[in-house]
Amino acid sequence: MSQASQAHDVTEATEQRLRVDLAACYRLVAHYGWDDLVFTHISARIPGDAHHFLINPYGMLFDEITASSLVKVDASGEKVAPSPYPINPAGFVIHSAIHDARPDVVCVLHVHTPQGVAVSAQKAGLLPISQQATVALASLGYHDYEGIALRDDEKPRLVNDLGRKTALVLRNHGLLTVGRSIADAFVAMFTLQRACEIQLLAQSGGVELVTVDPRIVSGVKSNVEAVTRGGGGALAWPGLLRRLERLDPSYKD
């Protein structure tokens, strides 16, 4: 086999692995109840090709998405492989902006969970009242609502608000996380979403809340790296895939 053929096979295998993981991510978002019919989106950069991405077929529910149904697009949002489905134009504006500005990011995950939107509408945003919140706050930004994300002129502001952070609260809109892998982006979202759920439960008690000392919050990032043994989302991801295998392995199709 020639070197060119070997390289082609490696590229195809890498893309297929990415497709399986991204389809798994969509199924997990649906499993945890974070989906919003067909109106949110998760994208992944194809390794070795900074200009091609995978994103959901617009019109498919997240629990229907499979590895083969994901749409491959270029930096302009044009399909580079046959697909009967379009892509969400708002999704492309958000995702293309981040992928273009952050070459370190492989995956961008965006949801409209009720808890996330509720916290995004609170002036104080995410409060340091739980361990989950301290983890999220270690790398969290905020982006003001500008309407449905269809305009390219919003991209610089979105990118600036994210900066080098891992997560973004989109005011009056939802939550967004990024990661060097699909696993990292998913686990970051799991933590942020859980922090929002805890905050709303705590606030519903109608009593004064105890907040974590800012000095503790500032040291959380190194603590997390120690707890995960530097593995990030990869520590939990295999178990999540095993869960999907038990529930419905068709995501790999």
What label would you give each PLM region?
Residues 44, 98, 112, 158, ...:
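Divalent metal-coordination and catalytic microenvironments
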Residues 12-15, 81-89, 139-149:
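Flexible, glycine/proline-enriched loop segments at strand-loop-helix junctions
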Residues 19-109, 116-127, 133:
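An anion-binding catalytic pocket shared by soluble metabolic enzymes
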Residues 114-156:
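Class I SAM-dependent methyltransferase SAM-binding "motif I" and its flanking Rossmann-like core
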Residues 49-51, 102-106, 131, 137-140, ...:
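Short coil/turn connectors at secondary-structure junctions
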Residues 3-5, 70, 142:
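N-terminal cap/leader regions of alpha/beta-hydrolase-fold enzymes
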Residues 2-16, 21-25, 166-253:
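A conserved C-terminal secondary-structure "cap"
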Residues 141-177:
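A contiguous binding-surface segment within folded domains or other stable secondary-structure elements
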